[in-house]
């Protein structure tokens, strides 16, 4: 047989006397074409294909004959085997049956009986009773014997039946195997099939192993701790991934950093999570030491004792806050001191006839909420909102309500000045109901008390309501532990040095205690109560003026008693260093809020809104709130008419909000404070601009959508190697256009093997900017030379689109 390339499938089929279809099926299965197309009768065959066909079909007839002969030879052998098996079964059955024959058992029993009778005759004669007893015993023994024999017989029959069933099943399986159609294959085909089966089995085991490993990895929770200061290189080493992958993840989050640059800790956590880790920022050793030193003692229920409630009185100017506090304290401070009680210690405590006490914050309500809350302090338990019955709800009243609601402090409404002729307490109730404060008598949950601070009417009832609410809140503290408190206000006294008003929240503060407060520390040299009397100790909820600070503390700082001066000094110094580092990064910016919204950290965009008119306020508030959707909410935490004040800035700082001013400007104090606290204030003259800016915040202005667009496709038809240049691809542009400097991919057999850019583009030795469809050109890919004829070059560009709501 001649093995040449000229032979076609149909020629070989005729030569071997088989159908072309059989050979085509064989080739498609065991020798597919390189281009993936099916074989046809007209296709030419190479040497290897011919060899496989002759091996498979050349000895077909001989194999068939051999199979017929073997089948004939096997037939009588199988018959003989069956006969032998049947004989064996019969023998087994006979053996079992032999053992079970009742005649044999009867003969044996009779023989035994005869022997026993002879023995009995030889023995001396027994009494009738003994004989009867023996007969009965024998009968019992015989019954037992028969029972045992019967059980043995049944067991043997059962064993035989089981064996028969097993043999029947085996025969059925053998028949099924024999009935299966046998595929006639040559030795070479059998070898190929064996190898294929082995390869499939091997691949199957590998796949199972991979799946097990994958499942094991998924089940394992990888936890890592990221230090507060970490570079890209260190992060890559920690995650055990290449640095370029870390840089790519950082770029996705809008952070451009080189391998030696530091990564913000919150971004490092996100990158770690993208690689399947559960990450958290590792606290500095100094911070951990501080936490250990300042760790609160475990509270035991039996050590806790009721403490007086801390109440803040809020309301609009001239609605009677100072007069009410004056009436409660039964003093005349408002008349004797310039500026009222706010010029005194800053807080006061009153004792009622029944011995119970209430602590009142004398600082203005809004200041108590903003300045203190901005630094994370939680001092106030209850707020009393004073509203004049003859004036109704005013701008500062609404501001006070918003402050209280923002921090979930329960409100008691004191409707003041009911002694005036034009007083209308019901009007106050109606107006406050519109702001969510519905009276209890109307089915709501807000306590309303009609009072007259001037005459003292119903003031006792107001105090009862405060104590009732305090009982419901179950306010308790442990007076026997080291003291913790909050600084309400501080001042620098020329004679006494730094002085601060402190409300003790837990434990008891004593003269001589060493303490740390924010970034300063000290030792209690002296304490004075709200009436100016010197005291040696201050239990929970007691306001005192403290002397002994090294530096002036800030309002809102937490005062914590420690063991000694050295501990206090070390903690204060470390806090000061940390604060200096944080001040460089800490700022409330709109851009930061964008990022928080995108990462799901912030679910609502908080806004303090100030406008020139009520109409503008209502229109802008409605427009901004309509931008809310299921994912992100716009929340106007405070809206009012007028200029941007110091209070607005502090509220924004406290609640993480931005300030939007429409046709308004911040006053000098507010401007100074916004720069100091770094609160973002946005000023607008057109409603549309304000809406657009907030809209951009919601959709994520700093994270545009990345989109890729293919602009052209070319086919490589020749390659040229040029010294000092590399491989140049001679291309034909199939569609679109190729652009010099544009991004490009090299595709070979459907697989991307290069992704870079077009370094140079030429037409007849001339550099060109672009080449359109239907033209030839020379293309040099940047830093890549392994280009082959038949490859395709895909030219594309990346566009960034802004997301929409």
From Swiss-Prot:
GO biological process: translational initiation
Domain tr-type G: 306-474
Protein name: Translation initiation factor IF-2
Binding site for GTP: 315-322, 362-366, 416-419
GO molecular function annotations of the record: GTP binding; GTPase activity; translation initiation factor activity
Secretion signal, residue range per the UniProt entry: none
Similarity field: Belongs to the TRAFAC class translation factor GTPase superfamily. Classic translation factor GTPase family. IF-2 subfamily.
Region (Disordered): 68-89, 141-215
Ranges where the record places region G4: 416-419
Main location: cytoplasm
UniProt organism field: Aquifex aeolicus (strain VF5)
Region feature G5, mapped onto this chain: 452-454
Taxonomic lineage of the native organism: Bacteria, Pseudomonadati, Aquificota, Aquificia, Aquificales
G3: annotated segments: 362-365
Region listing for G2, in residue ranges: 340-344
GO cellular component term, pick one: cytoplasm
């Amino acid at each position: 047989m001649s093995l040449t390339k000229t032979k076609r499938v149909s020629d070989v089929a005729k030569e071997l006397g088989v159908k072309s279809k059989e050979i085509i099926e064989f080739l498609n299965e065991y020798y597919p074409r390189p281009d993936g197309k099916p074989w046809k009768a007209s296709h030419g065959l190479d040497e290897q294909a011919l060899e496989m066909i002759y091996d498979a079909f050349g000895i077909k007839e001989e194999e068939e004959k051999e199979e017929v002969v073997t089948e004939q030879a096997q037939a009588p052998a199988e018959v003989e085997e069956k006969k032998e098996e049947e004989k064996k079964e019969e023998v087994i059955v006979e053996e079992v049956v032999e053992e079970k024959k009742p005649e044999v058992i009867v003969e044996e029993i009779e023989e035994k009986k005869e022997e026993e009778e002879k023995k009995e005759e030889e023995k001396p004669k027994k009494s009738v009773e003994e004989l009867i007893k023996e007969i009965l015993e024998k009968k019992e023994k015989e019954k037992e014997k028969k029972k045992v024999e019967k059980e043995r017989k049944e067991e043997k029959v059962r064993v035989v039946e089981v064996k028969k069933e097993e043999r029947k099943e085996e025969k059925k399986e053998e028949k099924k195997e024999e009935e299966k159609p046998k595929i006639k294959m040559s030795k070479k085909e059998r070898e190929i099939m064996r190898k294929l089966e082995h390869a499939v089995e091997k691949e199957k085991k590998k796949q199972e192993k991979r799946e097990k490993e994958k499942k094991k990895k998924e089940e394992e929770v990888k936890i890592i701790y990221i230090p507060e200061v970490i570079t890209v290189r260190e992060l890559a080493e920690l995650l055990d991934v290449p640095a370029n992958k870390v840089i790519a993840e950082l770029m996705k989050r809008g952070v451009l950093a080189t391998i030696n640059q530091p990564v913000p800790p919150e971004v490092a956590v996100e990158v770690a999570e993208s690689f399947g880790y559960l990450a958290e920022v590792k606290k500095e050793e100094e911070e951990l030491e501080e936490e250990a030193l300042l760790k609160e003692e475990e509270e035991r229920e039996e050590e806790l004792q009721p403490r007086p409630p801390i109440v803040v009185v809020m309301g609009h100017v001239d609605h009677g806050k100072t007069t009410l506090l004056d009436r409660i304290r039964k003093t005349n401070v408002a008349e004797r001191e310039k500026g009222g009680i706010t010029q005194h210690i800053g807080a006061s405590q009153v004792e009622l006839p029944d011995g119970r006490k209430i602590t009142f914050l004398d600082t203005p309500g809004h200041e108590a909420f903003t300045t203190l809350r901005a630094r994370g302090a939680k001092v106030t338990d209850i707020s009393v909102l004073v509203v004049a019955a003859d004036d109704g709800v005013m701008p500062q009243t609404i501001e006070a309500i918003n402050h209280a609601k923002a921090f979930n402090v329960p409100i008691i409404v004191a409707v003041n000045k009911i002694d005036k002729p034009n007083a209308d307490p019901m009007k106050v109730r109606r107006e406050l109901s519109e702001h969510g404060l519905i009276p209890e008598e109307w089915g709501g949950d807000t306590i309303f008390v009609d009072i007259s601070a001037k005459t003292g009417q119903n003031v006792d009832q107001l105090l009862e309501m405060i104590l009732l609410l305090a009982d419901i809140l179950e306010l308790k503290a442990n007076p026997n532990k080291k003291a913790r408190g909050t600084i309400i206000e501080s001042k620098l006294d020329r004679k006494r040095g730094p002085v601060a008003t402190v409300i003790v929240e837990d434990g008891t503060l004593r003269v001589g205690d060493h303490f740390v407060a924010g970034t300063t520390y000290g030792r209690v040299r002296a304490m004075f109560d709200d009436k100016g009397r010197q005291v040696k100790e201050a239990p929970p909820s007691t306001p005192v003026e403290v002397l002994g600070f090294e530096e002036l503390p800030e309002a809102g700082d937490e005062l914590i008693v420690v063991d000694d001066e050295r501990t206090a000094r070390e903690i204060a110094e470390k806090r000061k260093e940390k604060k200096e580092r944080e001040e460089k990064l800490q700022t409330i910016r709109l851009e930061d809020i964008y990022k928080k919204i995108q990462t799901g950290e912030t679910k609502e965009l908080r806004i303090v809104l100030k406008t020139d008119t009520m109409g503008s306020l209502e229109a802008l508030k409605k427009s901004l709130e309509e931008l809310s959707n299921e994912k992100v909410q716009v929340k106007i935490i405070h809206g009012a008419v007028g200029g941007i004040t110091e209070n607005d800035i502090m509220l924004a700082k406290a609640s993480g909000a931005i300030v939007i001013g429409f046709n308004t400007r911040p006053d000098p104090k507010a401007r100074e404070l916004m720069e100091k606290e770094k609160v973002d204030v946005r000023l607008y003259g057109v409603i549309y601009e304000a809406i657009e800016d907030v809209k951009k915040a919601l959709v994520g202005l700093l994270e545009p959508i990345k989109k890729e667009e293919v602009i052209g496709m070319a086919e490589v038809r020749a390659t040229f190697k040029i010294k000092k240049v590399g491989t140049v691809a001679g291309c034909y542009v199939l569609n679109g256009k190729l652009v010099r400097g544009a991004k490009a991919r090299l595709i070979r057999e459907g697989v991307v093997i290069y992704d870079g850019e077009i370094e140079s583009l030429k037409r007849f030795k001339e550099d060109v900017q672009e080449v359109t469809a239907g033209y030839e050109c020379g293309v040099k890919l940047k830093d890549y030379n392994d280009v082959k004829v038949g490859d395709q070059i895909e030219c594309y560009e990346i566009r960034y689109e802004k997301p929409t709501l």
